[in-house]
């Protein structure tokens, strides 16, 4: 996804939340070694959030759920004009797995991300589902399936477009 966004002059950084000690909770800093504050700073600095998750038993991972929970702290945060602090930023969902659930996961992610202020572009979700009960992972595929490549290109184009529009013309202040 980051490579596809780069085609639209969008640069980014990949953070694998599983590699960090992100404490459970709904505060900006849960203390005691919580690494969320550093991640939060990067999220706030970014115009685009790509939230990717595997499908586990038909649901998003507990780590993706934790990201949503930690973003809950932003509900009461506003900018100088009184807008939600994440309003004007764009979020997209990427879901991979060997079982059903991609549409439901995308819907859950979009609801949570929208609640904290993110906007989602047209066709803002990307997913790949392998065969149920098989062991082939997306990373094991010899090449990216054509439909996934097409959807990735569309998602990147629409995401970059919306982010540029919102940066140039923010949502009105209350």
What residue ranges belong to the model's regions?
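N-terminal beta1-alpha1-beta2 submodule of the flavodoxin-like/Rossmannoid cofactor-binding fold
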Residues: 1-81, 139-174
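A short acidic, often aromatic-flanked loop/helix-cap motif at beta-alpha or helix-coil junctions
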Residues: 20-23, 128-135
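Short, local alpha-helical segments
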Residues: 90-94, 136-142
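Short, glycine-/small-residue-rich phosphate/pyrophosphate-handling segment
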Residues: 80-131, 147-150
């Amino acid at each position: 996804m980051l490579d596809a966004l780069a085609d639209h002059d969008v640069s980014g950084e990949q953070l694998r939340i599983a590699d960090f000690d992100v404490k459970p909770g709904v505060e900006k800093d849960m203390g005691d070694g919580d690494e969320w504050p550093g991640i939060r700073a990067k999220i706030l600095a970014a115009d685009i959030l790509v939230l990717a998750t595997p499908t586990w038993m038909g649901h998003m991972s507990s780590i993706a759920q934790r990201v949503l929970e930690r973003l809950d702290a932003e509900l009461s945060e506003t900018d100088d004009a009184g807008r939600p602090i994440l309003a004007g930023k764009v979020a997209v969902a990427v879901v991979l797995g060997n079982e059903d659930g991609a549409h439901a996961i995308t819907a859950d992610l979009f609801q949570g991300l929208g609640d904290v202020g993110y906007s989602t572009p047209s066709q803002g979700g990307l997913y790949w589902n392998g065969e149920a009960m098989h062991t082939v992972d997306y990373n094991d595929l010899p090449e990216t399936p054509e439909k996934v490549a097409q959807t990735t290109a569309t998602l990147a184009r629409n995401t970059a477009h919306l982010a540029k529009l919102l940066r140039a013309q923010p949502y009105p202040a209350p």
